[in-house]
Amino acid sequence: MTLLQTIIISIVEGLTEFLPVSSTGHMIITQNLLGVPTGDEFVHAFTFIIQFGAILSVVCLYWKRFFHIDHTPVPADETCTFKKIIHPIRFYWLLFIGVLPAVIIGLAAKKSGLLDWLLDSVWVVAIMLVVGGIFMLYCDKLFNKGKEENQVTEKRAFSIGLFQCLSVIPGTSRSMATIVGGMANGLTRKRAAEFSFFLAVPTMAGATILDLHDLLNGDSSWASAHNLIMLAVGCVVSFIVALLAMKWFVSFLAKYGFKWFGWYRIIVGVIIIIMLLCDIPLNMVD
């Protein structure tokens, strides 16, 4: 992989990781356009490293939430002993509940080989971009009824986690699934988006650890000095771009909603489908 390919793919990852347009789908399309072999061991390592870089931007932007113990008094009307005990670390407890469904479904998909098959299919990406785009045109009217005082509860966290399971299908978008899941549970767009960011950290960190384990136990011939430098460059680029994209996205979503993202998804998906139907090669690089 060249330096230019590294930078382009990392920018795409950073821009799309937290937008409801499917970062995985865009990565697959971009790699095909640039002629990057998706089944290559180094490309696999590069993919999860730059995703990890993007996820680190959440911890950086919201570090006060991730490294803060709640010392506020337990609500006077709280009678559950367990909730009283976990009150100082309730933030982490909600993330644990939210990530459970994805862990179960993700491991099942990986063990069955379904995940690898889905990740190699540009058709799946294109179709899901269109389907998700159509849904997003109407989701504001369906779910935008949240009130600012709404809080993430254990029940809501688990429900959002179930929505996140849809993102195992490339082109669906983890961000879209979790934000819509939050709105469906009565949260505002801003509150739902922030919890989506938070939930991405344990979800993607867990996936990165699994991928890293598989990689370290496999063929290490790809780990040349050049490739390791490309990994470092990609991680830094995706981190910076994701940080900027995330700050912009929260304000844009609160003001304009999902409509423009929906149209974008539909346009990109239709273009890819037309190219596939007409046997137009996606590979722009010989």
Language-model segments: which ranges?
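Multi-pass membrane proteins that catalyze or facilitate reactions on polyprenyl-/lipid-phosphate substrates
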Residues: 1-286
